[in-house]
From Swiss-Prot:
Organism: Neurospora crassa (strain ATCC 24698 / 74-OR23-1A / CBS 708.71 / DSM 1257 / FGSC 987)
GO BP: positive regulation of transcription by RNA polymerase II
Source species, domain of life: Eukaryota
Biased composition (Polar residues): 89-117
Role, per record: Probable transcriptional regulator.
Name of one Pfam family that matches: Zn_clus
InterPro entries, per database record: Fun_TF, Zn2-C6_fun-type_DNA-bd_sf, Zn2Cys6_DnaBD
DNA-binding region: 22-49
Protein name: Acriflavine sensitivity control protein acr-2
Bias-annotated ranges (Low complexity): 69-88, 118-138
PANTHER family registered for this protein in UniProt: ACRIFLAVINE SENSITIVITY CONTROL PROTEIN ACR-2, TRANSCRIPTIONAL ACTIVATOR PROTEIN UGA3
Gene Ontology cellular component list: nucleus
Amino acid sequence: MALKKMPPKKPYHQKASKTKACYNCHRKRLRCDKSLPACLKCSINGEECLGYGIVLRWAACNSPTSTITTRTTNKTNFNGTNTTTPRTVKSSTPTQAPTPSDSPRQLDTDVTSSSAPSHTCSRSTTTSTTTTRISSPTLEETIDSFTVETPIDNNVDPLPRAPDDNPDPSSQIIKRPVNLIKIPLTDPLLNGLSTKARWYMHHFATIVCRDLVSIDQKERNPFRAIIPLVRKFDYLQSVVLATAAMHLSTIHKYQGRSLPSESALVDALMLKSRALHLLRAAINDNTLTDKAMILSAIVFLVNLDLIDSGRGGWKAHVGAARRLISSLYLTKAHLDGAIAPLVNAIAADCLTYRIYGSTISGNTSSWSDNTIDDGVVLPYILQNAEAYSYHCAPPAILQIILSASQLCSGSSTTLETDGGAGRIVTAAALLHKARNFDVQTWVYNIKGLPPDDDLEARVSVASAHRAAACLFVLLSVPETGLLEIPLLEPKDLVQEILGHLSCIPDNHVHLKGTVWPTFVVGAETDDLSERAWCLERLVAVWTKNPWTYPWGYVHTAMEMLQEIWRLKDLAAQQGDDGINWLQRLKATENSCLIV
């Protein structure tokens, strides 16, 4: 009797005691065989069975980058096209603060909000999308909660699979790295600031501070010393942000971007209003540091007006700042060494603005202050900032310009009753002092200049200021021309100024210091080609120079030049060739500031 061969026994698989399917089958809604230690169906499909218990998810990963596995399940719409259902994967990888390259149009509305901003970035696409939510488990990690939708390109091959992988055609697992960069916690100055405020602060530190000096030395730019102080003085923070917002608004306006320009302008005006409100509350603080910071805020309000158009309330700001300068410098007080360079540079800018503003701004008799203009305090303050001032004008020449402004008809507090003979003698003394000033010696003795500074260009700018100061004296006291001083005829001075200005290329860093002499010589000349050349130089400062961004006062200077030329040409047609454009301009009570 032949023995019957028994069929081989099938391998025994222990059944799971639980009735719940494994994690994979449960997610796919498949019938699970509930085998132990792993589901047999997962093994056949080449997948790793995740078991029957609770799936653990990482909630505090310290890695700066992570690979997020996302499952997208294909479904069929009623029109027969395939769609995908996104799954959500949670991670706690920190994210970075907004970079300066972000457009300000995409930033928060409240520029001083202290809460963490919520970012939402989305793209509409016909392909499948992956939604990733970043959770914030602890407040100390300062992680912004946001939702990022990343489009999945079906034409791009996923990461290589193992040879035994056999993916389910109804589902697809795509692993793609998500680079999430941590927030830089090393700079506490930005903590508590909104995204837009951080953008404005970055713009101030990188662009505005560069415009305020002759040559930007990152470690020696005194205006950057104001940034660490904005956390302590709220009015200073508002002024700094307002200045940066106005600067951005001017740039967008020049580029023809009306919406960003209007948005930044609204921010600037709101921040300026807030700064003025905070300054009123802090004006009674009597400590030395408080006075210095209030002075800084007021002078930056003048800078804000210059960036806007050079018009506005800069006169009131300059007057208030000069009173603070008197209390700081005349009391022989010693400032903290950390803020002394900042205060010196700001005080010098304030007095320089006062001097240039007095040249064409109508009656300035209310500005007379012998305690500042006594020939001792004024040069001392200006000399402390010679290496930083972008005007590149010698303090002695600036003082001559101020004295000539006080001699100008209708603006001098020392008008003589002897037919103006005293004014003529004083003006002649100013001319003699200006002509004998050694520009080259002054430039080569300036302390603190960078080694790569173009000293010859500085000599040309300072020489142009010296010749323009002489021309300004002749225009302020026209009777001085009767003395017939050699080489001091207006036409000779015009050619001298143009010669010095032509030595400075359009793309030179010191071109921004030539605005005032270019304006003076352009207003004086009657030659059409010279007028066109002066206007072209101002346009170069406004648009073409790579070392400075558009400031509104430069555009105002161009508009005023064209108006002066129109008045002079109209007077010439009527037979009046001897019009004094400076006297005519001062008679209009113009409040423009051209520096």
